[in-house]
Amino acid sequence: MNPMILTVAVAAAFLLGSVRPAQALVLHPDGEPNLAVWTDRPPKNVVGRWGGNASCVAVSPNCVLTTRHQGGGIGTLVEIDGVKYPVTQVWVCYTADLRLARLYGANLPDFVGLYEQTDEPGRQIVIGGYGVGAGAPLQANSRTYGYEWDDYASRSLRMGTNRIEDAAAQNELQEFTTDIVIADFDTLGPGGSTTYESIPAAYDSGGGWFIKTADEWKLAGLTRAVESHFEAGHANDPNYILYQSWFRKPDNPILPDPDTLDAVRISSYAQWINNTLPGVLPGDLNGNDHVDAVDFSIFALYWQRTDCRPPDWCLGADSEPDGDLDALDLAYFARHWLDTDPAP
């Protein structure tokens, strides 16, 4: 079994003194999955890049969830599947390190539902985020105990696995108070590690922790923080931070010493998210807040298709939804012809 490192968003301050905002995923050199052949995971396009320093997760055709500590807001560009969408509205969740953002021009085919159960501890997860990967191995007595974080220019989507170990309520980090779920970055081999064991690192804040239930992937957490390490004699001094992830003790690498990682606990905020999610303008198939000829051309592409499936139902053209595009869907589309959503 192979550990991977998930990084957090780059921030000036470090969370909880001994943890820091997450930035990216790091894996063991021989343990990174091939996303082209690894299918037991969420769709890659449910994870996006938030601005230039974090990640986010699509939870509707035009909205993403992310953390707050990395900054950004209205006007931030979110990149999903190679397309950049500007943020036009933001809703923040009370004191939590959590926000919902609406994307202009988005009608995303891939998005995930929320994991609303409170039985997360013990469940295996897939973690996804954009950020740096594993760099040089850290060794003592010819044993690897961790990894440097790779060059900060090396940012791409990475996915790995882990297992939620615990949960905590009202955890304070910077100016936020947030319910969290907690995992750790285990060593390779038998024990607590998972197949593609991973931990966040730079630019992974806001990336997803996903649980599979009834063959459906749901969002259980948003990467928030990882354990920090400092140069000797400079504990908790951000000027002497070590951009590393450990899974064994550096002074005795025979012994395990896994770094901790945590995420915003989605089940605690599911009601707020569901109540806040804005609706999608019926018939607006390209997400520009107008129902016009461009939307009709998209509708025509799917006309008489019989393979519309959740979550997107042929980009929303199958309005019933019942799996096919027929006269009833056309009548529904016509009823909303030239409708417009007012600017937020």
Language-model segments: residues:
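Chymotrypsin/trypsin-fold serine protease catalytic domain
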Residues: 104-199, 223-231
